């Protein structure tokens, strides 16, 4: 565009006076050229501003969103579910069974087996302890006799 404007005024005056035309030809093209170059300069920095924040915005939220929810969800529910039910179930029945039959086996296994497991499971180990020692001491001495006689 600027090349066409320079050619038009420059081509006409040189025909009249080449020497005189050179001087006035230089300043006129500078005047119209100056404002024209400034105008397109203004819109250039404007689109520059949105270009900078645009790539910045998507870069920040993208890595933030997947990093926070992804590790949070699987870490919380996975270890919580297996850890709670697994140790809870075996811990309750395991200590109840070995604690009661251990002292009962040497003292009186026959009468203790049917009486101990029944109240131990529904009631708890508390009533099991006072009931076992009381009947067990008197049956300690006859227990070997009963076993021998029953075997015969």
Swiss-Prot record:
Q: What induces it?
A: During squamous metaplasia induced by cigarette smoke exposure.
Q: Which Pfam families does this one have?
A: Cornifin (PF02389)
Q: Which body tissues produce this protein?
A: In squamous epithelia lining the nasal vestibule and in the hard palate.
Lineage, top-rank taxon, reads Eukaryota
Keywords attached to this Swiss-Prot or TrEMBL record, sorted alphabetically, are:
Cytoplasm, Keratinization, Repeat
| Gene Ontology CC: one annotated term | cornified envelope
Q: Where are the sequence repeats?
A: 27-34, 35-42, 43-49, 50-57, 58-65, 66-73, 74-81, 82-89, 90-97, 98-105, 106-113, 114-121, 122-129, 130-137
Report the principal subcellular site.
cytoplasm
Annotated region (14 X 8 AA approximate tandem repeats) at 27-137
- Which intervals of the chain are annotated as region Disordered? 20-40
- Which family, according to UniProt? Belongs to the cornifin (SPRR) family.
Please report the name of this protein according to its UniProt entry.
Cornifin-A
Which gene is the coding source of this polypeptide chain? Answer: Sprr1a
């Amino acid at each position: 565009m600027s090349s066409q404007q320079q050619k038009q005024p420059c081509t006409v005056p040189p025909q009249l006076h080449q020497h005189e035309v050179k001087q006035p030809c230089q300043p006129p093209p500078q005047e119209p050229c100056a404002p024209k170059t400034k105008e397109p300069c203004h819109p250039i920095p404007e689109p520059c501003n949105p270009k900078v924040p645009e790539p910045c915005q998507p870069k920040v939220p993208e890595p933030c969103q997947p990093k926070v929810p992804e590790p949070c969800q699987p870490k919380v529910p996975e270890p919580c579910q297996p850890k709670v039910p697994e140790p809870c179930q075996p811990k309750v029945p395991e200590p109840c069974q070995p604690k009661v039959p251990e002292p009962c086996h040497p003292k009186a296994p026959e009468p203790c087996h049917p009486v101990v497991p029944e109240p131990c499971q529904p009631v708890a180990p508390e009533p099991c302890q006072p009931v076992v020692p009381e009947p067990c001491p008197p049956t300690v001495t006859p227990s070997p006799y009963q076993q021998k006689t029953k075997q015969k």
